[in-house]
């Protein structure tokens, strides 16, 4: 998605440890017009998947997930990272390691909002090692729902997440594919049909 790549080039910052900081438009300050376009793009890519719900993990995945749900006309569920006083029983859970924060969080989704007939699209802001998506896959397995794919805003192609998900048969659609962050520069992987 060229618009997203341009935004990354303009506002993204490469930090030590192969971290791409995009807090100017995605995971701190949010560009709502870009998020709307991201949601529309995911909806177009998965238009024939008969999606009934969109799932994400709080908090950076919420904006693109909500816009995807809006474009598809389906509800959005975000897996909570912290225990809630109002959601204290009847939960599906999984442990997820955060590459950027170097911590493990237990994510949870209420059984109340999940139906065994659901066809779920997973949305995440980044795909590096695939831990957030893997956690959502574990919850989907516990719930007995079908995952139709994973929509990723920014994929780090030089890390194993996408290949590991593909090996499990998960359809991955990434809007920006970063091939390298070497020397503080963001390089993108060209996709078929691009010059």
Swiss-Prot record:
One of its GO terms (biological process) is xanthine metabolic process. It comes from the Bacteria. 5-phospho-alpha-D-ribose 1-diphosphate binds at residues 128-132. It catalyses: XMP + diphosphate = xanthine + 5-phospho-alpha-D-ribose 1-diphosphate. Xanthine binds at residues 20, 27, 156. The keyword Mitochondrion does not apply. Coiled coil: none annotated. InterPro entries: PRibTrfase_dom, PRTase-like, Pur/Pyrimidine_PRTase, Xanthine_PRibTrfase. GO terms for molecular function: xanthine phosphoribosyltransferase activity. It is found in: Cytoplasm. Pathway: Purine metabolism; XMP biosynthesis via salvage pathway; XMP from xanthine: step 1/1. Its EC number is 2.4.2.22. Keywords: Cytoplasm, Glycosyltransferase, Purine salvage, Transferase. One of its GO terms (cellular component) is cytoplasm. Converts the preformed base xanthine, a product of nucleic acid breakdown, to xanthosine 5'-monophosphate (XMP), so it can be reused for RNA or DNA synthesis. Homodimer. Belongs to the purine/pyrimidine phosphoribosyltransferase family. Xpt subfamily. This is Xanthine phosphoribosyltransferase. It comes from Limosilactobacillus fermentum (strain NBRC 3956 / LMG 18251) (Lactobacillus fermentum).
